[in-house]
């Protein structure tokens, strides 16, 4: 992730249009953005950007984006308006490094920590809490904590998680049908 990016946000893909995706921002992690949606331009020609097909509608991502301030002279072709460099004040997502993380619930995975090869976009790692990433971008969490949180879990831990899930499967029949609010204080 790039703390020097113009905008870092958590958002959900709501639409794909040509080589761009429209995101609904859920949380701004770095920078400022005030609109209800944001257009992010992806791969076309030989620009160092990921393909739009990697970001399906409904998927959630943390993206470190660069704002388009100027469109190059050959950046727009009227015969293919949905395949272009992008428009001024929209954003681009680079694939030349770790600029996006896949989000699942309250965690994210991807090319997160410094030192990972720049084109290694799906590393073996543990999911990292979004709040930890936000704390890192705010300067409240050190890089070492982020690196430690992302370390791949040992196989023993994965086995323990699977054993626990297996043990708990079917246990709902043994639990009372009351919520904590229904219980009386002693």
Question: Can you annotate each of these PLM segments?
Answer:
Residues 1, 39-51:
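N-terminal post-signal-peptidase region of extra-cytosolic proteins
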Residues 1-2, 183:
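N-terminal low-complexity, Pro/Thr/Ser-rich intrinsically disordered segments
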Residues 4-28:
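Structural detector for short beta-strands of small beta-barrel domains
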Residues 6-8, 42, 56:
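Short, well-structured alpha-helical interface segments that form or flank functional binding sites
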Residues 13, 23, 40, 62-63:
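Hydrophobic beta-strand residues in large extracellular and virion-surface proteins
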Residues 16-18, 31-34, 54-59:
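A short, structured loop/turn motif at beta-sheet edges
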Residues 19-43:
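OB-fold (S1/OB) nucleic-acid-binding surfaces
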Residues 48-186:
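Netrin-like (NTR/C345C) domain of secreted extracellular proteins
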């Amino acid at each position: 992730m790039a703390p020097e990016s113009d905008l870092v946000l958590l958002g959900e893909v709501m639409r794909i249009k040509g080589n761009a995706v429209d995101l609904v921002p859920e949380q701004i992690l770095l920078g400022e953005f005030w609109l209800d949606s944001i257009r992010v331009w992806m791969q076309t020609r030989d620009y160092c950007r990921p393909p739009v097909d990697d970001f399906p509608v409904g998927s959630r991502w943390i993206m470190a984006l660069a704002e388009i301030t100027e469109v190059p002279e050959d950046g727009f072709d009227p015969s293919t308006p949905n395949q272009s460099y992008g428009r001024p004040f929209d954003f681009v997502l680079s694939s030349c490094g770790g600029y996006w993380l896949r989000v699942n619930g309250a965690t994210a995975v991807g090319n997160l920590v410094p030192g990972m090869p720049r084109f290694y976009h799906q590393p073996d790692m543990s999911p990292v809490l979004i709040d930890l990433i936000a704390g890192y971008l705010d300067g409240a969490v050190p890089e070492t904590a982020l690196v430690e949180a992302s370390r791949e879990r040992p196989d023993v831990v994965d086995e323990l998680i699977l054993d626990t899930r297996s043990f708990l499967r079917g246990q709902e029949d043994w639990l009372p049908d009351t919520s904590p609010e229904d219980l009386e204080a002693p």
